[in-house]
Amino acid sequence: MRRRRAEPRVVSPDPVYGEVLVTRMVNKIMWDGKKSIAQKIVYGAIDILSQKTGKDGIEVFKQAIENVKPIVEVRPRRIGGATYQVPVEVQEPRKTTLAIRWIVDIARSKKGKPMQEKLAEELLNAYNNTGAAIKKREDVHKMAEANRAFAHFRW
């Protein structure tokens, strides 16, 4: 029997931009509880974004995350001994979580530059609808499209 659903944690807005989205990015980048370092990385990346685009960095940041958010994903569902990949719509909080996770993971996987620059580069690519994070979203959508025949197994 399943227990009740966990209450989502309330994330406070960040001190510089007053945005919850920035705090979530900082928390995702943070390692070993070193929040001040993570904040420097994120704020530095946002500054780089505003320099490169000539627009408000926080707006570019928000749009980049919006562009990466997936609409559908596949989840495994076991039916009669077979496991099907069933396409399901992604709930809003998970959309944001996945977008942030993909951007940070891709930025981390790049080599040879400081994290600020790697993160700014990936956010800029996402803003322009290019780059690995957008490809990841497209792959997830393709997988859901390929398994559309199993959509009637949704729960």
Curated annotation (Swiss-Prot):
The entry's keywords: Ribonucleoprotein, Ribosomal protein, RNA-binding, rRNA-binding, tRNA-binding
A Pfam family: Ribosomal_S7
GO cellular component, as recorded: small ribosomal subunit
Gene3D superfamilies, per the entry: Ribosomal protein S7 domain
Protein name in the entry: Small ribosomal subunit protein uS7
Organismal lineage: Bacteria, Thermotogati, Thermotogota, Thermotogae, Thermotogales
Native source species: Fervidobacterium nodosum (strain ATCC 35602 / DSM 5306 / Rt17-B1)
CDD domains in UniProt: uS7_Bacteria
Keyword rRNA processing carried by entry: no
Record-level Gene Ontology MF annotations: rRNA binding; structural constituent of ribosome; tRNA binding
Gene Ontology annotations of biological process type: translation
NCBIfam families given in the database record: rpsG_bact
